[in-house]
Amino acid sequence: TNGEYDGQFLFIGDKSHGRIATIDLRDYETKQFADGKLMHNDHGGCFVTPNTEYVIEGAQYAEPLGGEYAPISQYKEKYRGLATFWKFDRQKGRIDVENSFAIELPPYWQDLADAGKGPSDGWAFMNSFNTEMATGGIEKGNPPFEAGTTQRDMDYMHVFNWKKAEELIKAGKFEVKNGFKLISLKTAVEEGVLFFIPEPKSPHGVDVTPSGKYMVVAGKLDPPVTIYSFWKMLKAIEAKDFEDKDEYGVPILRFDAGKEAQ
């Protein structure tokens, strides 16, 4: 509530099935499993917006959305990542699946997340790794799997304008896949919902400071801790201060345009 933990509910991801559990802390009982039916795994962590409007779930390993089959040779074309924003009904103490939505992402591997607060309320931030889109295949002369997923010095922090995404849902600018509302990657880019900014390789956590002014990223394979300024990132977005776009068309902010310190 208002960015402060109130101890009423607990949310946790089911890593092997891509579901979210809602636990009522009055009796410590699991009241609900919510399944979006688009992704069959997640990182396990869940993160809530300042007034628990949404519970944020990041898919970890890319797959064809909805569980359809596609050969690994079509990884870049057919596989996708996902960020799900589960609408929470506090009065009922349940996730409202019908009013939840997901944002289609490139087939990088999404990791931990956090929601903005105060000046950054309405935004969310999520790590990623394997922006190399490595799929293994050492027997075919490709790099070993772990080495393949860690070749680059930088991965991408995903920056979401979830308030704008919510407006798109209300305006009907979404698809329905397996009965779940989905903002396509194309729409997310065109409508300014999704941006990337480089972050040191294989990060494991992005935490918003209590003031909501800074995002702190640290990783498993890169020693520095990187602090990003929300205002600097917002200014860069408004100025279109991009270093490039990824191959899916997502704008990439310049690292130094958003970095506060390291």
Where do the language-model regions lie?
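Predominantly soluble domains enriched in secretory-pathway, periplasmic, or organellar proteins
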Residues: 1-262
